[in-house]
């Protein structure tokens, strides 16, 4: 277990690609906070202006222009974490296919089968690894993230 502690990981092991989080609600926002606390380059998208204002006021790199965020992900070879409700995943994947066609993708969406079916429909399996959220509450939005 000590090998997994952050203070036991070498700087070479910490050389991660930038992380792009699409969806800065409870889970996406919490991931952003944790990554930033570890000095990992992280930026993200939320569709709400209020979410962008709140996140940027706290010093986080958040935007509400999905095209710009995904273009940046592409140019920095970022890993994209999809953290949106299931009903929004198809549109997000379509945007990723258009603006970040070579980035790795994972997700923290609450269901796996539906996400994977959408991934297959877009022939994105080679760059996708499904994830699972390990936190959550009844609250939502940037303000609920910790």
Predicted regions mapped to residue ranges:
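NAD(P)+-binding Rossmann beta1-loop-alpha1 motif at the extreme N-terminus of oxidoreductases
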Residues: 1-64, 70-72
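Conserved beta-strand segments of alpha/beta enzyme cores
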Residues: 41, 62, 104, 127-129
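Rossmann-like NAD(P)-binding element
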Residues: 66-104
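Short beta->alpha hinge that forms the Motif I/post-I loop of the SAM-binding pocket
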Residues: 47-48, 84, 108-110
């Amino acid at each position: 277990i000590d090998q997994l502690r952050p203070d036991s990981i070498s700087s070479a092991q910490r050389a991660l690609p930038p992380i792009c989080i699409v969806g800065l609600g409870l889970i996406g926002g919490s991931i952003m906070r944790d990554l930033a606390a570890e000095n990992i380059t992280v930026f993200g998208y939320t569709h709400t202006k209020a979410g962008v204002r709140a996140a940027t006021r706290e010093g986080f790199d958040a935007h509400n222009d999905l095209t710009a965020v995904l273009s940046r992900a592409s140019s920095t070879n970022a890993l994209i974490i999809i953290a949106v409700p299931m009903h929004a995943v198809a549109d997000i994947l379509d945007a990723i296919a258009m603006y970040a066609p070579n980035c790795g993708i994972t997700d923290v969406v609450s269901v796996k089968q539906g996400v994977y079916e959408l991934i297959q429909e877009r022939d994105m399996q080679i760059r996708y690894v499904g994830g699972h959220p390990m936190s959550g509450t009844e609250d939502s939005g940037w303000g609920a993230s910790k």
